[in-house]
């Protein structure tokens, strides 16, 4: 940042990393000493921090482990600066994704947010191809072709 945030922006400006929910429904998460399950339906208490109702964060902490029990989906996000917030963004602005958020502190111009994202890597793993068909549809006599 060229200069610290103006006072009216403090607590509002941050960085969001979004996580596609469909891959994580029913999977667990750990954020420091807190644990939970990624819900299929957005629920939870509401807060009104800046004049608009939002769901409260699912948890706040420094180190998030997403899907610790699933080798193909596990990843770790660790903040070297401030706290991480885990949000269910499906209730906020009809976002549709889970959100990991870090808020930019008031007094920083360099290294305002520093995260380390570590995927779990499975050696020699190869993605299985998915065969698709046209979503536009086919004519009555038109042969169906794999694309």
Q: Where do the model's predicted regions map?
A:
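Short secondary-structure subsegments characteristic of cysteine-rich extracellular domains
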Residues: 19-21, 144-147
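Contiguous beta-strand segments within globular domains
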Residues: 128-146
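Beta-strand-rich recognition/accessory modules
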Residues: 59-127
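Residues at beta-strand starts and edge strands
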Residues: 1, 11-13, 109-113
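Short loop/turn segments at connectors of secondary-structure elements within structured domains
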Residues: 9-11, 109, 127, 142
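Extracellular glycan-targeting catalytic surfaces
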Residues: 1, 115-117, 140, 147
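Secondary-structure transition/turn motif
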Residues: 1-7, 103-106
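Polysaccharide-binding surfaces and accessory modules of carbohydrate-active proteins
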Residues: 3-74
């Amino acid at each position: 940042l060229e200069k610290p945030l103006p006072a009216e922006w403090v607590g509002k400006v941050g960085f969001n990393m979004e996580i596609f929910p469909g891959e994580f429904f029913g999977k667990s998460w750990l954020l420091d000493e807190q644990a939970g399950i990624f819900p299929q339906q957005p629920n939870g208490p509401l807060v009104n921090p800046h004049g608009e109702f939002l769901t409260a964060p699912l948890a706040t902490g420094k180190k998030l482990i997403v899907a610790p029990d699933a080798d193909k989906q596990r990843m770790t996000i660790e903040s070297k600066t401030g706290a991480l917030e885990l949000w269910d963004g499906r209730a906020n602005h009809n976002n549709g994704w889970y959100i990991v958020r870090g808020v930019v502190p008031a007094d920083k111009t360099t290294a305002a947010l520093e995260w380390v994202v570590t995927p779990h890597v499975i050696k020699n793993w190869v993605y299985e191809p998915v065969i698709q068909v046209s979503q536009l549809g086919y004519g009555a006599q038109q042969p169906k072709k794999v694309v």
